[in-house]
Regions:
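ATP/NTP-dependent adenylation/nucleotidyl-transfer catalytic domains that generate, transfer
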Residues: 1-148
Length: 148
């Protein structure tokens, strides 16, 4: 779903794109998974993301992803969207979890419910995570990468 529906009833295009605001879903899903599931620091997530996404021809793609749906991202793009993710996730989203109604925990392994596995203060500040990302992830790709 998009943030703002199309204002023109004859237009099939939304007035605002969620992905233009928060970043590509595939990158943000990647960020969410590795930060919440493994607790990796932002620079490690950026490293993993770069190695997963910088070259379309490298590695295997799931069978259901057509070639025209495959995206590559350079380091600057990965860092930009990871910075937005870190700020939104750690600084401006946790209060929502403390205001949810009571309910059961369903499933395991990665729940973001305040009744489940994830515990974060509702008044958290993202400064530590943002500083770690900015200090340890360059703004552009290195001249060469180690083989592998």
């Amino acid at each position: 779903p998009e943030l703002v529906p199309a204002s023109d009833t004859h237009s099939s295009q939304p007035a605002q794109s969620t992905q233009a605001t928060i970043g590509p879903y595939e990158l943000q899903d990647f960020n969410l998974y590795f930060i919440t599931r493994y607790g990796f620091r932002p620079s490690k997530v950026a490293y993993l993301s770069y190695n997963a996404w910088h070259n379309i021809a490298r590695g295997a793609w799931p069978a259901g992803i057509r070639p025209d749906q495959r995206n590559a991202y350079d380091l600057a793009t990965i860092k930009r969207w990871l910075e937005i993710f870190v700020f939104r996730f750690f600084q401006i989203s946790q209060f929502k979890r403390s205001a949810v109604p009571n309910g059961p925990k369903v499933g395991s392994g990665g729940s973001l419910s305040p009744r489940g596995d994830w515990r974060a203060p509702s008044d958290a500040v993202a400064t530590a995570w943002l500083n770690e990302l900015r200090q340890h992830v360059p703004d552009r790709e290195p001249e060469s990468l180690p083989p592998g």
